[in-house]
Amino acid sequence: MAKKNSKPKAGSNTIALNKKARHEYFIEDEIEAGMELQGWEVKALRQGKANISESYVFMRDGEAFVSGMTITPLNQASTHVVANPTRVRKLLMSRRELDNLLGRINREGMTLAALSLYWARSWVKIKIGVAKGKKLHDKRDDIKDRDWQRQKARVMKSSLR
C-alpha cells in the first residue's frame, strides 16, 4: 500500500498575494507579523475573502497597523456585530522588531508594503516588505526582462521539439 503524503502543498496556506507591491517597489527585506482580528474576520479568511492589493502598513505611537486591506464579511456572519471590511488592523510584533522597522522607514524613500497574507498553523500572518519605490524606467526594465525570459523559454521549448 502506498504511503500518503501528509505534507500540505506549498501554496495552500496562502490567503492573498499583493503582486502590485513587487511591481511598484524594490523589496529590500521581508518581515512576518501577526494580526489582531475579530471572529468574523477569521471565518472570512478561512473562505479566502481577502484583498490586500491596495493595503499599506504605517507606524503610529510605536505600533504598526495595516490599512486598506479588505476582508469581505460572510453572509452568515454574526448579526450582533457590525462588520467593517476596511478597518485598520493592528499588527502583532515584538518591540525589537517594531523599533527596527521604525528606524528603517525613517530613511529616505523607504516604506512598508503588505506582500502576502497566509496561515501559519492556526494563526493568520502577514508578510511585510521594507520597500523603496521604483521609478518608471525601473518598471520598464523589469517588463523588458520578463519578456526576454518568456522569449527564451519559447525558443528553448520549440528547439526541444
From Swiss-Prot:
Checking PROSITE patterns in the record gives:
SSRP
Coiled-coil residues are none
Which cellular component terms (GO) are annotated to the entry? Answer: cytosol
GO terms under biological process: trans-translation
Principal localisation: cytoplasm
The UniProt entry, under Pfam families, shows: SmpB (PF01668)
Q: Which family does it belong to?
A: Belongs to the SmpB family.
The record describes the protein's role as:
Required for rescue of stalled ribosomes mediated by trans-translation. Binds to transfer-messenger RNA (tmRNA), required for stable association of tmRNA with ribosomes. tmRNA and SmpB together mimic tRNA shape, replacing the anticodon stem-loop with SmpB. tmRNA is encoded by the ssrA gene; the 2 termini fold to resemble tRNA(Ala) and it encodes a 'tag peptide', a short internal open reading frame. During trans-translation Ala-aminoacylated tmRNA acts like a tRNA, entering the A-site of stalled ribosomes, displacing the stalled mRNA.
Subcellular compartments: Cytoplasm
The protein's GO terms of the molecular function aspect are: RNA binding
The coding gene here is smpB
Protein name listed in UniProt: SsrA-binding protein
Q: Which organism is it from?
A: Vibrio vulnificus (strain YJ016)
Keyword set, alphabetical order = Cytoplasm, RNA-binding
